Amino acid sequence: MENFPTEYFLNTSVRLLEYIRYRDSNYTREERIENLHYAYNKAAHHFAQPRQQQMLKVDPKRLQASLQTIVGMVVYSWAKVSKECMADLSIHYTYTLVLDDSSDDPHPAMLNYFDDLQAGREQAHPWWALVNEHFPNVLRHFGPFCSLNLIRSTMDFFEGCWIEQYNFGGFPGSDDYPQFLRRMNGLGHCVGASLWPKDLFDERKHFLEITSAVAQMENWMVWVNDLMSFYKEFDDERDQISLVKNFVTCHEITLDEALEKLTQETLHSSKQMVAVFSDKDPQVMDTIECFMHGYVTWHLCDARYRLHEIYEKVKDQDTEDAKKFCKFFEQAANVGAVAPSEWAYPQVAQLANVRAKDDVKEAQKPILSSIELVE
């Protein structure tokens, strides 16, 4: 395994944060903790239900970690939506992360997908059955156009995860494959469309801005994620078909060249995002900017991305990029480093155990006859 290109990563991260003029002021600390706990508490109770526990079959520690990661992403990035919308989106995106981390072959459960869909039957695939049950809770927040984007993008995501089960990075010379797969599993349209709940935006009035935002967000969101994920995925066996690694295979280039390709595309997308919306409806621009800054804060602060390891490694270095990166990291930590113990309680496993005990008690109650009830 090659050594991680720390200096290049620092330079790339600094350029990105400078391009978007990073300055996360989305919340006070009290507001952040309040929203985190509200979204987490509702989502935790959802996943503690017996049906979810039985059908997902996810290791409790992994489910807990996934839920905490997603709640952080949604609350930090969707700073303008209601707490109820945050909670429902947190549940939806936790389902997607659970699928992304799974290794089950979906083929057998997908044989009758369309027939079941057309007939209104429950899907054989347990993930689809649960996601479809929750979808109305998500879609109630959005107009029909945004809702269609959420549905379609979620279907694309499932297909992208299916492709990833084969650990196939593309054939050499297949230049379109890396971006094809990344668009498929990136949830860019789902994210881009879920920024515009109908209680804040009339999608008919803002149709052009929303459509453009979905188009721009598709690339910006996934490319930033790929850059910020590059460190954690660098030597992870599960993540060897990342966009950067697929660039190496399909374009037949070096790892440094692939990272530079991703860097240039991300920076260009960041420039576009700021330029396109800077003179549009102020509420639209504010929503996009809050998302961008919150999304970066989440990556810098969430343990899943391990960027604190980079910080610890370079904090005593005297290079310009190291100093700038550490300044940005500390800026993010000042607003976004909130210990899970302050908001992620109770644990899903604890809630599930309480439910299980209550179900046992209910089952053990004596059944009274109709005569006894009358007496």
UniProtKB/Swiss-Prot annotation:
The keyword Ion transport does not apply. The keyword Transcription does not apply. It is an enzyme of class 4 (lyase). Keywords: Lyase. It holds the Pfam family TRI5. GO terms for biological process: sesquiterpenoid biosynthetic process. Pathway: Sesquiterpene biosynthesis; trichothecene biosynthesis. It catalyses: (2E,6E)-farnesyl diphosphate = trichodiene + diphosphate. InterPro entries: Isoprenoid_synthase_dom_sf, TRI5_ascomyc, Trichodiene_synth. Its EC number is 4.2.3.6. Changing Q317K: In strain: IBT1958. Changing A124S: In strain: NRRL 28336. GO terms for molecular function: trichodiene synthase activity. Belongs to the trichodiene synthase family. Trichothecenes are sesquiterpenoid toxins that act by inhibiting protein biosynthesis. TS is a member of the terpene cyclase group of enzymes. It catalyzes the isomerization and cyclization of farnesyl pyro-phosphate to form trichodiene, the first cyclic intermediate in the biosynthetic pathway for trichothecenes. It serves to branch trichothecene biosynthesis from the isoprenoid pathway. This is Trichodiene synthase. It comes from Gibberella zeae (strain ATCC MYA-4620 / CBS 123657 / FGSC 9075 / NRRL 31084 / PH-1) (Wheat head blight fungus). The gene is TRI5.
